[in-house]
A protein has these predicted regions:
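A glycosyltransferase accessory/donor-loop signature
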Residues: 1-11, 21, 41, 51-52, ...
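Short, acidic, metal-binding catalytic loop of nucleotide-sugar glycosyltransferases
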Residues: 26, 30-37
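Short, hydrophobic beta-strand segments that form beta-sheet elements in well-ordered domains
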Residues: 36-44, 95, 119-121
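Short, polar loop motifs at secondary-structure junctions
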Residues: 42-48, 61-62, 103-105, 124-125, ...
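Short loop/helix-cap segments at secondary-structure boundaries that form the rim of catalytic
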Residues: 46-54, 109-114
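Active-site-proximal specificity loops/subdomain of glycosyltransferases
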Residues: 48-89
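GT-A fold catalytic core of metal-dependent nucleotide-sugar glycosyltransferases
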Residues: 58, 78-128
Length: 269
């Protein structure tokens, strides 16, 4: 039996304010270093080229109507069509990553040789609190679709088909699950699809077995000091062990400061 192919998929579509393709390229340069896996970009940009990606798959143009609120500002957010990951992935085992996820370790590799249909992040925390919460009052907790690891099985195929159905009928599912903010979120769609797939039972066997660290404040700079990371904001400095991080500050991910951090991090090994 031939060895299963393994790789990473990143979706990225630019908006008028954020160059998500550049964020994805920086993410790819990091994961090629830490995970040493091929990386496929899925984008609706018809002309974008970058050799950091092993493969670029182009999809139909995404609408620009979805929004998110961060740092007292409403941003356009083109996060739809994630359900295409199953169909378009060229790999037997896929790590589906958001471009703002910094894989600073090789921890995700530990999941690839285990037996599973799919695994999703259940819990996330920041420097002060656990971020896991219900989608709405009286509803289920959402999952973090920031990282989804999956094998090509019938159950996984069913999951992504359900995500597609939920995206296309999002208002209906929002009403069903008591969600009042109807701005589309993959975190919600995957949580609902996961619940339905598992017979309306929560199956913790389909969870990534550790919590995700999310930094949800604006960042001034980051620095690695031996086995620690120093994350500086305008007011504070946070010292944490080296670990994977979900970064919410997209402007920092586009900054020269972050570019320099990546170059130093990659070249230090």
């Amino acid at each position: 039996m031939s060895e299963k192919s393994k790789g990473i998929i990143i979706f990225a579509s630019n908006t008028d304010k954020i160059d998500y393709l550049e964020i994805a390229a920086r993410c790819a340069s990091l994961v090629r270093h830490t995970l040493k896996l091929p990386v496929t970009l899925i984008t609706d940009d018809e002309q974008y080229q970058n050799s950091v990606f092993d493969n670029i798959v182009r999809i139909a143009a995404l609408d620009n109507t979805n929004t998110k609120y961060y740092n007292n500002t409403t941003w356009a957010w083109r996060n739809k069509s994630r359900y295409l990951a199953y169909e378009l992935s060229p790999y037997d085992t896929t790590i589906l990553l958001d471009a703002d996820y910094l894989a600073l370790t090789d921890n995700l590799l530990k999941l690839l040789d285990t037996h599973f249909d799919y695994l999703i992040v259940k819990d996330s925390y920041n420097t002060q609190e656990v971020l896991t919460q219900p989608m709405a009052r009286g509803s289920i907790n959402f999952l973090w679709a920031t990282v989804v690891v999956f094998n090509k099985t019938q159950i996984t195929k069913n999951l992504f088909e359900l995500v597609a159905r939920i995206e296309n009928r999002y208002s209906y599912y929002c009403a069903m699950f008591n969600i009042f903010n109807q701005s589309y979120r993959n975190d919600y769609a995957f949580a609902i699809a996961d619940l339905i797939i598992n017979g309306y039972h929560l199956d913790n066997n389909k969870r990534i077995p550790w919590s995700m660290f999310t930094f949800d404040s604006d960042i001034k700079n980051m620095e690695r000091l031996n086995e620690s990371l120093i994350i500086r904001t305008d007011k504070n400095a946070h010292i944490i062990p080296v670990q994977d991080i979900h970064i919410m500050d997209k402007l920092y991910l586009l900054s020269d400061s972050y570019k320099n951090f990546l170059e130093e991090y990659i070249n230090a090994a």
